[in-house]
């Protein structure tokens, strides 16, 4: 294993985190808050460690998927550990476990919180908490590829390890250009949302932090009641942008280059929009009688469907009080998730499409055993290797989910709480149902359960395997052998 390039990547990530921590420091100056000193200290620490790790450039800059997965998993763990230190130093979240949970939830764009009173945080910490969503939304390593030349053609292994979904690839021949293009679209949509929210008389600070949460599909609000206290206009702006950030970014690339027919013909995007429309209609009629008006019913149903399927986690109402049918739809949407190549979480719409087509193919083979039928996506045949990897992904997901529910259930909480808590964390949604509903939090869980859910959040964001590979005996053996060689 090429440990020198892994070390260099980790150092680059630390330097990036240190640089990004300058923003909450600026916020602390604007609001005259002393919490900024803690962020400055951690930022300088990140930069110092980062420079130490990158001082000696690796001679061998070529690495493969194995190194890409290890680099990605370790980068996200390290990013979260250093990112949580300011919360502890400011004593706004004094417990390291709680601070780490909150930070992992931020970077993985989950939005599950342990805080009872979000509004008690300083503006500095509120900003950093929301900013972690924006950093993690498109992926920290994708950002790194956009600004730092790492290792030539091998960069694809970093993007492959971090990118959400089974069909994310290069938009243009040069990977660096792809990364920059992705962030250009990401940044552009974020700025447009901020402007539209400010036009709706939302305070500038609120507009920026809300847009961070929407863009990264994270859902950390700066109000205890999330988005429910804002105007109807703001609710609809957030709804629309949640849906937009849940779309495969390849579609925006095609639109930018005026390939409208190809963009609107994308099978996954069409399925994604159909699922949203059907879900909104079903929930609307289900909650109409209990709503104060039809306008509120359609607003709440559209907002919550968009929030859950994109795994954002904002809320405008306590959907814990909705009828069972509506809550069931929301739980199903948690697992479906957004499109591949978006900032959303969940299993991804494309995986379900291929799985359903695979099921249809197997059924047809029983009826017509001599006919060879290929699975197609957007009119193109899907390689057998892709279908196989999706089947393995589903099996792995089920195993991790089942084990996690069993471990969390040791606390003796009700089944709905345990099931949806794990579903909300592994799918990077945020709120669940019952005791982890939208107006509740995860603070009541034990340290064991919190660490289980931290693992789930990281596994869900990294598409399971980059994190799991750290526990592979061969990788552990290589890591320890590298340590022994370095001592010698």
Report the location of each language-model feature.
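Membrane-proximal intracellular helices of multi-pass ion channels
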Residues: 1-488
């Amino acid at each position: 294993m090429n440990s020198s390039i892994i070390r260099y990547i980790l150092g680059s990530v630390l330097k990036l985190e240190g640089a990004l921590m300058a923003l909450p420091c600026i916020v602390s100056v604007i609001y005259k808050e002393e919490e900024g000193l803690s962020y400055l200290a951690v930022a300088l620490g990140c930069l110092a460690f980062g420079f130490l790790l990158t001082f000696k450039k690796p001679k061998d800059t070529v690495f493969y998927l194995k190194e890409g997965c290890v680099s990605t998993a370790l980068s996200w763990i390290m990013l979260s550990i250093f990112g949580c230190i300011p919360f502890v130093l400011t004593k706004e979240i004094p417990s390291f476990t709680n601070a780490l949970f909150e930070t992992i939830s931020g970077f993985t764009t989950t939005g599950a919180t342990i805080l009872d009173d979000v509004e008690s945080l300083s503006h500095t910490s509120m900003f950093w908490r929301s900013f972690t969503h924006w950093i993690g939304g498109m992926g920290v390593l994708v950002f790194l590829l956009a600004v730092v030349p790492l290792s030539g053609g091998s960069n694809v292994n970093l993007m492959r390890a971090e990118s959400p979904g089974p069909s994310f690839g290069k938009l243009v021949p040069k990977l660096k250009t792809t990364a920059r293009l992705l962030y250009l679209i990401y940044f552009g949509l974020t700025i447009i949302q901020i402007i539209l929210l400010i036009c709706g008389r939302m305070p500038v600070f609120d507009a920026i932090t809300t847009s961070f949460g929407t863009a990264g599909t994270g859902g950390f609000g700066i109000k205890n009641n999330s988005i429910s206290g804002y105007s109807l206009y703001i609710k609809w702006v957030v709804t629309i942008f949640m849906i937009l950030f849940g779309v495969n970014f390849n579609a925006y690339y095609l639109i930018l280059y005026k390939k409208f027919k190809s963009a609107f013909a994308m099978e996954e995007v069409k399925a994604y929009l159909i699922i949203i429309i059907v879900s909104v209609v079903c929930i609307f009629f289900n909650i109409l009688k209990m709503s104060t008006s039809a306008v509120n019913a359609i607003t709440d149903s559209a907002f919550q469907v968009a929030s859950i399927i994109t795994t954002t986690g904002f809320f405008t109402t306590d959907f814990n009080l909705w009828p069972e049918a509506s809550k069931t739809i929301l739980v199903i949407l948690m697992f479906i998730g957004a499109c591949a190549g978006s900032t959303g979480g969940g299993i991804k719409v494309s995986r379900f499409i291929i799985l359903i087509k695979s099921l249809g193919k197997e059924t047809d083979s029983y009826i017509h055993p001599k006919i060879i039928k290929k699975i197609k996506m957007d009119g193109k045949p899907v390689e057998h290797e892709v279908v196989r990897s999706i089947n393995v992904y589903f099996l792995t997901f089920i195993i991790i989910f089942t084990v996690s529910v069993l471990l969390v259930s040791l606390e003796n909480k009700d089944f709905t709480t345990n099931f949806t808590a794990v579903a909300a964390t592994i799918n990077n949604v945020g709120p669940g149902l019952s005791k982890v509903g939208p107006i509740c939090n995860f603070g009541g869980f034990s340290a064991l359960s919190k660490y289980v859910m931290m693992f789930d959040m990281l596994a869900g964001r990294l598409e399971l395997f980059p994190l799991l590979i750290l526990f592979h005996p061969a990788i552990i053996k290589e890591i320890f052998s590298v340590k022994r060689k370095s001592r010698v």
